[in-house]
């Protein structure tokens, strides 16, 4: 026996039923759909229609809204930054900005800038220029000897 002579056992693969191909097939004429009515027509299902019962999408309450003023920050964790520094993709000498993070492959798209979060540990002293940072991230960066400059944030005195 050769590989090109292999074949299935008889009846191992059942052919699919081709409906509407003559009455002798047992599934001809109406094709197993019965006679007349909504369900016998093509494009039968009406999405969400439950036979007159109040459909689920109308039974459940409306919820929430999309805030058009919400800021869409790209999130970067300190652990990832430390890994990039150790891999040689980030230098600690110059300030770390959005462009530097994008070049290092840590950020893809950032509509409203980058937000720094404290997951992981940072041992290198780095200066960050970012749009936002969590209090824990600022504390961790300053503990490592670095600094966080929040760009675009109004100083407290100017906010009055």
UniProtKB/Swiss-Prot annotation:
Give the similarity note.
Belongs to the universal ribosomal protein uL15 family.
Q: Which NCBIfam families does the record cross-reference, listed alphabetically?
A: rplO_bact (TIGR01071)
In terms of superkingdom, the source organism counts as: Bacteria
Subunit description? Part of the 50S ribosomal subunit.
What GO terms are given for molecular function?
A: rRNA binding; structural constituent of ribosome
HAMAP family membership: Ribosomal_uL15
Which gene specifies this protein's sequence?
A: rplO
Which organism is this protein's natural source? Rhodospirillum centenum (strain ATCC 51521 / SW)
The protein's name in its UniProt record: Large ribosomal subunit protein uL15
Q: Per the record, where are the segments of Gly residues compositional bias?
A: 21-35
Keyword Ribosomal protein on entry: yes
């Amino acid at each position: 026996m050769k590989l090109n002579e292999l074949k299935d056992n008889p009846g191992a693969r059942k052919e699919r039923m081709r409906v509407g191909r003559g009455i002798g097939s047992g599934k001809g004429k109406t094709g197993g759909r019965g006679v007349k009515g909504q369900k016998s027509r093509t494009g039968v299902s009406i999405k969400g229609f439950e036979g007159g019962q109040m459909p689920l999408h109308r039974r459940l309450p409306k919820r929430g809204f999309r805030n058009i003023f919400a800021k869409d920050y790209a999130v970067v964790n300190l652990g990832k930054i430390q890994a990039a520094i150790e891999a040689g993709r980030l230098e600690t000498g110059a300030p770390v900005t959005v462009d530097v993070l994008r070049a290092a492959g840590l950020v893809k798209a950032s509509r409203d800038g980058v937000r720094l979060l404290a997951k992981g540990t940072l041992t290198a002293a780095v200066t960050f220029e970012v749009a936002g940072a969590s209090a824990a991230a600022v504390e961790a960066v300053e503990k490592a000897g670095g600094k966080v400059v929040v760009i675009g944030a109004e100083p407290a005195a100017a906010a009055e």
